[in-house]
């Protein structure tokens, strides 16, 4: 009897765990809100940067394409940023959670990837190709459930891809800020001023939670500055930002101005 009760207890724990997973994993139905992975690689010096570029360009991105993901973004800080030469941002979009969960297994079985990326994947412990990397996993907002690729005629080293992170003091404040973007109309204002958004999304796993992140794009730094001036002075923003329900929904804003690499799909 005791053994049966013990087994029943284990099963109860597993069932409870299983049904708690959808809080993170179930997400929206297939074909609706996408999921995004942002990898942030920390590097030191030109040597690591060159090895990172070689790996991403010739091994990782082609393998991800073979795995069924046609678009991968790679970005680096602008030249006047103190993080220039120290960080590489990787953006991978997934049509659903299953595609995210399957990618690792597909890469492990991809012999071409294993061969072409060997020097990076299995580098000597005392000569690593990067210091560390962190992963942020996000779910797209319902008012922009699918990412977009902007189209510019300017060279890549002139384009600005602005990644923003908005942290909130509490879960309730974070939810209200997401509401402000969606139902409140903040996304619509960005559309009106021509901010060329790539995505808006809620961080569901990662550091500095609760928070949301989004990326807008511009043909040049001049276009970037003009768009933000237009946003700040837009009558819809003045009305929206004055509403009491949205007060104090953001406690910290982090802004990262980036250029796409020459081999980025963006």
Q: Could you describe each region identified by the protein language model?
A:
Residues 1-32:
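Bacterial Sec-dependent N-terminal signal peptides
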């Amino acid at each position: 009897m005791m053994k049966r009760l013990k087994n029943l207890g284990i099963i109860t724990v597993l069932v409870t765990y299983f049904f708690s997973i959808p809080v993170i994993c179930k997400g929206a139905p297939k074909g609706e809100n996408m999921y995004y992975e942002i990898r942030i690689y920390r590097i030191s010096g030109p040597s690591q940067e060159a090895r990172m570029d070689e790996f991403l360009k010739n091994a990782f991105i082609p393998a991800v394409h073979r795995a069924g993901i046609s678009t991968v973004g790679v970005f680096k800080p602008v030249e006047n940023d103190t993080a220039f030469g120290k960080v590489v941002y990787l953006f991978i979009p997934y049509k659903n959670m299953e595609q995210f969960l399957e990618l690792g297994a597909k890469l492990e079985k991809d012999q071409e990837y294993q061969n072409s990326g060997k020097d990076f994947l299995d580098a000597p412990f005392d000569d690593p190709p990067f210091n560390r990397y962190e992963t942020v996993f996000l779910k797209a907002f319902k008012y922009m459930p699918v990412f977009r690729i902007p189209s510019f005629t300017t060279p890549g080293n002139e384009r600005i891809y602005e990644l923003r992170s908005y942290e909130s003091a509490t879960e309730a404040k974070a939810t209200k800020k997401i509401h402000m973007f969606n139902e409140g109309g903040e996304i619509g204002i960005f559309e009106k001023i021509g901010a060329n958004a790539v995505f808006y999304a809620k961080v569901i796993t990662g550091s500095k939670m609760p928070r949301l992140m989004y990326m807008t794009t511009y043909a040049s730094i001049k276009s970037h500055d003009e768009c933000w001036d237009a946003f700040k002075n837009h009558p819809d923003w003045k009305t929206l930002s004055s509403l009491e329900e949205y007060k104090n929904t953001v406690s910290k804003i982090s802004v990262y101005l980036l250029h796409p690499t020459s081999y980025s799909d963006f």
